[in-house]
Structures are given as C-alpha cells and as structure tokens.
C-alpha cells in the first residue's frame, strides 16, 4: 500500500512540474494536429495580462490549406453564426484541442473570427471581437497579391516559410484567414487588440498536450499492483 501511495504522489508531482517551452522552432511545438508533409504554426496572443501572453500549436497538412482551416482544425469546437446573431448557427465542427472553443461570423466576403476561449482547468481565457477590441491577423510566409487602400496597383507578398522563429518577420495581413493559403513553414498569429490598440506579437510558448487525468493514472497504478500481487500469490 505504501508503494501505491508513493507512486501516486509521484504521478501528481510529475503532472504539476511540467515546464513551459519557449518556441524557438517547429521542433519545440508540442501540440500538433493534422497530417501531411507540410507544417505550419498557429499563434494566439491574448494580451490579457495572463501568462503566457502568446501560445503556439502546430498543424500538418498536404494539398491546399488556409489560415481559417488551420484554426478550425486546432479548436476543439467551432461554431459559425450569422453576424450579430449567435442563435443562427450555420455550421459546427470539431477539432483536436478540446480546451479551445471558437466562434466565427460568416459575412458575404468570408469568415471573420469573433471569439476564442481556452480553458485548461487551471485558467480560463476568453477574447471576443468587436466588443472590447478585435483580433488582429498577422502572418509570415506565403505568396499572394493584395491591394492597399487608395493604391490602384496590386502588391505582392512573397516570402518563403521557415521553421525557425528567429526568421519570422510578422506581417499585418491584408487578406482574411479564409483567403490566406498556407505554405510549408508558414506562421499565422491572431493577436487580440484590447481597446483597439495593436501590439507586437511576442515569441510564443508551446501549448502542452493535455495530460491524462490524475484519476486515470492512479487507477492504472492500482491495477498494475493488484495484478502483480495476484501473480505473486
């Protein structure tokens, strides 16, 4: 019995001692979803005085992929509604990280991010678009044409992706996440601007893979020792 108690305490200690990892490259990202040879990073920056300020997930894909597609693949639950009418649900989808929920409003020109919530059981973080600020969209890596306000000439953004954060030069996106096509090594950041005041994207910490609950681990330990005792009886 003492052995079981000791092992259980070690399990609890191990869960609580997991350190946060600053993302220097894709190799530091812990939570990945999707499949394919290409890799991209999703960064959420809350700017809510909580820690960490900025968090990163990874997304694997092949063929064609978009910024909004990556966001929906990561979010555990996504709800798409009519603008200003949360009761009219147009679409729902399920992603990989059950700690994150996402609300998107669908306009004629495309989908617009409204709110993101993240709850890991320790802290709960929620930011909503157009109420106390807005989600600014920044990116790195890609190839697309765009127009600037008042400029009749089309401009081109053509920057190769990189798995290294030291290579990232954030660019305020002139296109929406629905139109943004990912490239291998691309980074997308949604940074909340409280009071509609923008701020620079800071180097993110890796979002951890959710651990099995303590109860499940302790149950496994108990079953293991019960079977061992029977075998030795």
Language-model features: where?
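Amphipathic, positively biased hydrophobic alpha-helical segments used for protein targeting
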Residues: 9-11, 196, 226
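Short, charged juxtamembrane terminal tails flanking transmembrane helices
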Residues: 230-233
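Sec-dependent N-terminal signal peptides
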Residues: 4-13, 218-222
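Ubiquitin-like/PB1-type beta-grasp interaction modules and other compact soluble beta-rich domains
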Residues: 20-208
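Sec/Tat signal peptide C-region and signal peptidase I cleavage site
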Residues: 15-19
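A short, hydrophobic C-terminal helix/tail in secreted or cell-surface proteins
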Residues: 210-227
